[in-house]
Amino acid sequence: MKKIVLATGNQGKVREMADLLSDFGFDVVAQSEFNVPEAAETGTTFIENAIIKARHAAQITGLPTIADDSGLEVDYLNGAPGIYSARYAGEHASDGDNLNKLLMAMQDVPDDQRSARFHCVLVLMRHADDPTPIVCHGKWEGKILTAPHGSNGFGYDPIFWVPEENCASAELEPVRKKQLSHRGKALQKLFKAIEEQRTC
């Protein structure tokens, strides 16, 4: 099994990514195990922030690194919270704080104007100076509920309605979420890209 560093401090992402990556033969080590401090997310896009995080962790650990930058884009809010999803309610906001702020912002918004999507950008940096990191994007369409449902997942999962399953993301079984989610889709693309490079 190939060791790879996961460049995030978000424990929900660590659990979900470790589970997804183990399916593809990777031994995932969280950056916290190497005492890697969080990188300053100074980018203006998911791609920029993912590259910043991946390069930062690769420089410190000397190992290949995968970084994930993801977020929720709500049409009614002109794409917010977007790249600020993890800190929508403030710099050290909890998942609950962010979720509640979003529910307040969407209060009284009609059902046909609650469309939203999750985005996930994954970057694989083979080493800190990798000139051609692998960049993959996954998207998951849904809408914002008026109240939380379910106890699985993390972040905005309890208020993200999944039309094809007729439930909230937080009500999905983990195996099904892997198949549908923005992160699962981005990982499928990432491993396809890795396989293609191995055969070049």
Swiss-Prot record:
Cofactor field: Mg(2+)
One GO molecular-function entry: XTP diphosphatase activity
GO biological process per UniProt: nucleoside triphosphate catabolic process; nucleotide metabolic process; purine nucleoside triphosphate catabolic process
Pfam families, alphabetized: Ham1p_like
Leading EC class: hydrolase
Cofactor note: Binds 1 Mg(2+) ion per subunit.
EC number: 3.6.1.66
Transmembrane intervals: none
Cross-referenced InterPro entries: dITP/XTP_pyrophosphatase, ITPase-like_fam, RdgB/HAM1
Family statement drawn from the similarity comment of this UniProt entry: Belongs to the HAM1 NTPase family.
Protein name, as recorded: dITP/XTP pyrophosphatase
Organism: Vibrio cholerae serotype O1 (strain ATCC 39315 / El Tor Inaba N16961)
